[in-house]
Amino acid sequence: MDKKEIFQSVTSMEEQLSHLYRQLVQLKEHVVQLLEENHHLQIENDHLRRRLEQVTSELAEEKQKEKDHKHGHERKLVDIGEGYDNLARLYQEGFHICHVHYGSVRKEGDCLFCLSFLNKK
């Protein structure tokens, strides 16, 4: 190899290193964006879980008040039926009963679709 070929080889490696460095910088920026987005989504998820718990407890309290009110006036409760009882039991055992995830195991707490189905009259 003569000096010119060595110089061209070094110049080529320098360009390749420069290109790899630019790619590394872009990748680093993308990772930062993903980490920020993940953090924001975790915060939003926590807020939604708290709101779901709040709404669920409010609905339970409201339902209890309504039930107490009906018993106070000696009204007969409508017999919901065996099918509803079976679905409620499945839900309590940890399975989805909603049309979206029917039959799959609930992994993270309550499901809004299932709860809305159970709260229908």
From Swiss-Prot:
It holds the Pfam family YabA. It comes from the Bacteria. Binds 1 zinc ion per subunit. Keywords: Cytoplasm, DNA replication, DNA replication inhibitor, Metal-binding, Zinc. One of its GO terms (cellular component) is nucleoid. Its cofactor is Zn(2+). Its main location: cytoplasm. Zn(2+) binds at residues 96, 98, 111, 114. GO terms for biological process: DNA replication. It is found in: Cytoplasm, Nucleoid. The keyword Chloroplast does not apply. Belongs to the YabA family. Involved in control of chromosome replication initiation. Inhibits the cooperative binding of DnaA to the oriC region, thus negatively regulating initiation of chromosome replication. Inhibits the ability of DnaA-ATP to form a helix on DNA; does not disassemble preformed DnaA-DNA helices. Decreases the residence time of DnaA on the chromosome at its binding sites (oriC, replication forks and promoter-binding sites). Tethers DnaA to the replication machinery via the DNA polymerase beta sliding clamp subunit (dnaN). Homotetramer. Interacts with both DnaA and DnaN, acting as a bridge between these two proteins. HAMAP family: YabA (MF_01159). This is Replication initiation control protein YabA. It comes from Geobacillus sp. (strain WCH70).
